[in-house]
Every structure is written in structure tokens, then in C-alpha cells.
């Protein structure tokens, strides 16, 4: 496969993944996304109060279960709240704010696919192998689903992919400063 065809296929797969994930994130019902309603309490709290929640606060705690996702790491909720705050400048629509919050997962999934292609390019001499790796990871049904709703998982997969990529680069360059910093 020549270089031009490879990059065309790679960018089309990345764009296709983004379109599928973003499109699904727009139409996915909250009740079909596990715990999303409860996870959404965190970015909603951040946007409305302009402060980080304490997990013991009533407004972020589930009354039936008695716990809150604010007791867990919530970096993705902070990122989602930025997208929600930007969206709230234009509209107060609950659907638009939900889609804005889901954008964190969509972009994390898309970023993961980009990094998987970079990993494939580092590991394999043949471009087809890198392309196949991207196809396998990017179009696993569960991965596409994780990239469509508010959760920590898609961002966690993205950061692990980044760690693996820079680890591979570091091993190839004897961990020069550039590869250690990223």
C-alpha cells in the first residue's frame, strides 16, 4: 500500500469513527447508557455552581444507592463541564448540554484511534498492519459504545494508549527527554 492510500484510508477511518460516535451520542437515550444520569450530576453541578462537588453533597448523591460519582476521580466530568459551559452560552437545551458532555467521550475515543494508528506505525513496517490495528480497535462495538456517552472509560483507554505509544517511542530512543515528556 502506498503512503497516499494509507493516509487517505487512515483519515477516513478516523473521520468515520468520529461521525459514528458523535452521531450515536446525539441520538442515544440516557436510559440506554449505564449510570449516565448519575454521572451527569457532576458536570451539571460544576456548570451551575462553578465549583467542584464534594461526594457527600445531596445534590450529587443518588438517594437510593447512597453514593456519588463525585467520590471517584472525575477529570472527565471537569472536561465535560467545559464543553457544557461553552454550549450553555448558546442554548440551555438539556439535549444540547448532554451532547456537549458526551463530546469528552467522543473525542477521547477518536484520540484513542489516532494513537492506535501511531502505535501501529511504530510497531509495524507494513502500513496495512497499522491500518488493521486501527480497524480492530476503532470498530469494536463496545469501544464505539463507550465513546458515545458520559463515562470515564473512554478517557482511560485514551490515556493508556498514550502511555503505550510513548513507552514504545521511549524504548526506541533510549528514553530521550522528548519522548519522556511527550
Regions found by a protein language model. Give the residues of each.
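Short acidic/glycine- and proline-prone juxtamembrane loop motifs at membrane-interface regions
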Residues: 142-155
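Transmembrane-helix motifs of polytopic, lipid-linked glycan transferases
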Residues: 99-124, 162
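Membrane-interface transmembrane helices that cradle and orient dolichyl/undecaprenyl
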Residues: 121-128, 163-181
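Transmembrane-helix signature of polytopic, membrane-embedded enzymes
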Residues: 8-14, 92-95, 116-139, 157-158
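Helix-to-loop transition at the C-terminal end of transmembrane segments
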Residues: 22-37, 153
